[in-house]
């Protein structure tokens, strides 16, 4: 006899979603610090989540209203159900990529100053107010913890052809030195040099000069990515802002 089968129809099913699984790096270490620091870190995290969700809900495009969030401590799932119509499907993908880009911009900027790693894929998912389940979640999680390595959000190779053949979507994708594709979140940001530079200062101040080799690699990757994107944008107001290691 199945649990609660008299009251439940057992008719929930997975659907096609585009899914991002994100990990905010260093949160476990922040939890282990003194009470005053913990309080600031906890409130930063809470406001990062609530502001991102509020921003997604307020964007005056219907497709953004269906973006779903599932949060557990320093991990977040952002998902969007995909339409079966090809033109709407591409718009769904764009909405998700844009939403995740906003989240990452907020996280690395001077309002928070934390690095993000993650994975994005398309596949079967079930998501409601109680739980999240499906192969897409597992794939996105594996991309984050086994492939991403650096503070980047890796995009599943299986969906790359669909993205890079669309002019608008292709702006959200870059290929890295190891041939992995990742989210070019700064494609949505303009005149953000000072915000990014100040965010990088926060990251380094938080570490107080105590870098492990792994942390150093992550900081260098982030610094190089941001500086390259600022160089490409070549915006006059941002020419004096570049990230530097202390």
Where are these regions (language model features)?
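Catalytic NTP-binding/metal-coordinating core of nucleotidyl cyclase/transferase enzymes
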Residues: 2-102, 111
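Intrinsically disordered, glycine/charged-rich C-terminal tails and inter-domain linkers
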Residues: 2-9, 149-246
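Short, solvent-exposed loop/turn segments at secondary-structure junctions
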Residues: 27, 125, 160
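A short acidic (Asp/Glu
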Residues: 30-33, 81, 128-138, 164-166
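Catalytic strand-loop-helix junctions within cyclic-nucleotide turnover domains
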Residues: 82-89, 119-131
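Catalytic-core segments of nucleotide cyclases and related cyclic-nucleotide turnover enzymes
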Residues: 89-97, 127-144
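Catalytic/regulatory signature loops of cyclic-dinucleotide turnover enzymes
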Residues: 109-113, 117-118, 122, 139-159
């Amino acid at each position: 006899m199945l649990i609660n089968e008299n009251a439940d129809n057992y008719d929930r099913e997975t659907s096609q979603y585009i899914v991002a699984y994100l990990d905010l790096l260093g949160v476990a270490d922040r939890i282990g610090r003194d009470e005053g620091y913990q309080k600031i870190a906890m409130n930063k995290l809470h406001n990062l989540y609530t502001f991102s969700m509020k921003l997604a809900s307020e964007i005056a495009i219907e497709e953004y209203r269906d973006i779903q969030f599932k949060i557990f401590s320093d991990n977040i799932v952002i998902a969007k159900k995909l339409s079966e119509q090809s033109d709407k499907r591409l718009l769904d993908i764009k909405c998700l990529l844009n939403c995740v880009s906003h989240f990452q911009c907020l996280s690395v900027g001077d309002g928070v100053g934390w690095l993000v790693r993650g994975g994005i894929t398309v596949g079967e998912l079930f998501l409601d107010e109680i739980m999240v389940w499906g192969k897409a979640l597992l794939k996105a999680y594996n991309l984050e913890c086994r492939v991403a390595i650096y503070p980047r959000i890796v995009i599943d190779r299986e969906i790359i052809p669909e993205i890079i053949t669309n002019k608008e979507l292709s702006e959200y994708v870059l290929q890295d030195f190891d041939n992995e594709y990742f989210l070019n979140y700064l494609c949505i940001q303009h005149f953000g040099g000072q915000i990014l530079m100040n965010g990088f200062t926060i990251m380094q101040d938080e570490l107080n000069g105590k870098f492990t080799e792994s942390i150093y690699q992550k900081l260098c990757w982030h610094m190089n990515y941001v500086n390259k994107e600022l160089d490409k944008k070549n915006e006059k107001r941002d020419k004096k802002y570049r990230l530097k290691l202390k």
